[in-house]
Amino acid sequence: MTAKNFRAFLLLSGALVVAGAAADVWLLDRPLPVVQRKLKDSPTTTLTQAQLEALLTRIAPALSSEMRSRLGEAVLLEANRAGYDPLFVLAMVSVESGFHIQATSERGARGLVQIMPSTFAWISAREPDVGGDDYETGQDPVVDVRLAVRYFRWLERRFGSRDDALMAYNAGPKRLRQYKLVDEIPDRIKEYPRRVKREYTRFVGLLASNSPVEGSEVLLARAQSSKPVLTVQR
């Protein structure tokens, strides 16, 4: 079976749900429920391409200037499409790989956003406009990031909570549902949303101290307060 046929099979098989960044493919007895409301994290920072690239120079110095440019463009594009703050997307990339393009997990997740090959095949078939059919996971970091944002959006629609979607990205949706069913989510899974939020807060602070980005001072105050950040507006 060719790679493209395999991807088409995954897309057409309604029972398949692809697990998160560090998990396997799971077979579900029934499809996950879709949350019947719009989930949106309205960005409060207004970033230009140049500002995002300048930030990437500070937080990801190992990336080439060309890669920073391509990554910044992709993050702005997908964040705007999904209604996310681009700093949230960068926070996920930072936690997943530390911006190391060749990062590989023990379970086979690869790249900047640690996508499993099965996840990559499934979401690239589901989102053909990204062009993932021409690649395998890890071959083009920008394609990986674009597909990861769309995969996360898919998780958020089904779990209805930003924190739950983050945990599902880390553990896999089926496994997270099993943990929640018995009310025994491992601490390492619970910690994942907090790690993303810490990176988000750090990036907001870097922006506020380095450049007059619209909304950065307000966002920094929110991030440093006791109120949760990166919540879903209902």
Question: At which residue positions do the language-model features occur?
Answer:
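Hydrophobic alpha-helical membrane-insertion segments, chiefly the h-region
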Residues: L16-W26
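Catalytic glycan-binding domains that act on GlcNAc-containing polysaccharides
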Residues: D29-S225
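Short, solvent-exposed mixed-charge patches
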Residues: V232-R234
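Iron-associated oxidoreductase/ferritin-like identity signal
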Residues: F6-A8, A23, S211
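N-terminal Sec-pathway targeting helices
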Residues: M1-A15
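Compositionally biased regions
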Residues: G14, S226-K227
